[in-house]
Amino acid sequence: MRVTDFSFELPESLIAHYPQPERSRCRLLSLEGPTGALTHGTFTDLLDKLNPGDLLVFNNTRVIPARLFGRKASGGKIEVLVERMLDDKRILAHIRASKAPKPGTELLLGDDESIHATMTARHGALFEVEFNDPRPVLDILNAIGHMPLPPYIDRPDEDADRELYQTVYSEKPGAVAAPTAGLHFDEPLLAALREKGIEMAFVTLHVGAGTFQPVRVDTIEDHIMHSEYAEVPQEVVDAVLAAKARGNRVIAVGTTSVRSLESAAQAAKNDLIEPFFGDTQIFIYPGYQYKVIDALITNFHLPESTLIMLVSAFAGYQHTMNAYKTAVEQKYRFFSYGDAMFITYNPQAISERP
């Protein structure tokens, strides 16, 4: 399959630069996987689409202020984007500079250049940086870091983004991008879902900056997926198996929840799904056999991205591309701060190719 098969025309005006004033009032495009039927509504329509006993699986990662600005002690300006925190003193990061720093290079970070760090090693495209500061890494990032808004949100980050670019249930710091399908859930909607008898479970996948990297090959089978850390604890496994046993659906909130659950299913030896703690490089594209999820809540993704490929593998290629064409025509808002989709599984998707 060619990467260009997953291209579509997207007017710049449809890229959302700010979220809706009220999280749950975004638009919702529902796609019935087996038939391709589309319906238009608002996000709170989920209350009517979910049945008592259905299981929503959320990603409870929390976005860290992962973008740092500063300079090398020798003078050159740098921009640091944390990929992951290694421990209380060290990070793995992308560094943008006119000349890549060498191991041993001293870095001065923050608006006042008060934070001192050392680039200690290079690992391919990533740099290991150690802070020369008594505070834990997370405290330093909270003090001097900027929220790492995606490259397609063409504006500087603002103080409000520290909360707007977080899910209301975020709990475990470590992501450099929000699991954006979850941004639409507010406390009143979560309370209404619980009141209806909807079950909830939480995985963790710390979204890395690689999620924004373009696919740089022509044939998607040649693409090597970036690695991200995921946790699927025993209580999630129990909730999934219980939902399946009683005939209810497992609904992933966001592609990161999909990738967490399907990684746990791939690693399982004896059951449908088993606990999973570790890095995953799972790459889901048409032809993939979904094992766990029955429905998916997700935002609208970039053309030619691995995420639109994941959706195509779930709903079917033709249904997905038609839904995106309709979304553009109907002026849905795209990407992280945009509108959402609710998609049910298409069993025929596995045999469908572009």
UniProtKB/Swiss-Prot annotation:
Gene3D superfamilies listed in its UniProt record: QueA-like
The protein's enzyme class: transferase
Keyword terms, alphabetized: Cytoplasm, Queuosine biosynthesis, S-adenosyl-L-methionine, Transferase
Localization of this protein: Cytoplasm
GO biological process: queuosine biosynthetic process; tRNA wobble guanine modification
Pathway in which this enzyme or protein is active: tRNA modification; tRNA-queuosine biosynthesis
GO molecular function, one term: S-adenosylmethionine:tRNA ribosyltransferase-isomerase activity
Pfam families named among the record's database cross-references: Queuosine_synth
Source taxon at top rank: Bacteria
EC number(s) recorded for this UniProt protein: 2.4.99.17
Disulfide bonds: none
Major location category of this protein: cytoplasm
Family matches, as InterPro entries: QueA, QueA_dom1, QueA_dom2, QueA_sf
Protein task: Transfers and isomerizes the ribose moiety from AdoMet to the 7-aminomethyl group of 7-deazaguanine (preQ1-tRNA) to give epoxyqueuosine (oQ-tRNA).
Family as reported in the entry's similarity comment: Belongs to the QueA family.
Protein name per UniProt: S-adenosylmethionine:tRNA ribosyltransferase-isomerase
Record organism: Salmonella dublin (strain CT_02021853)
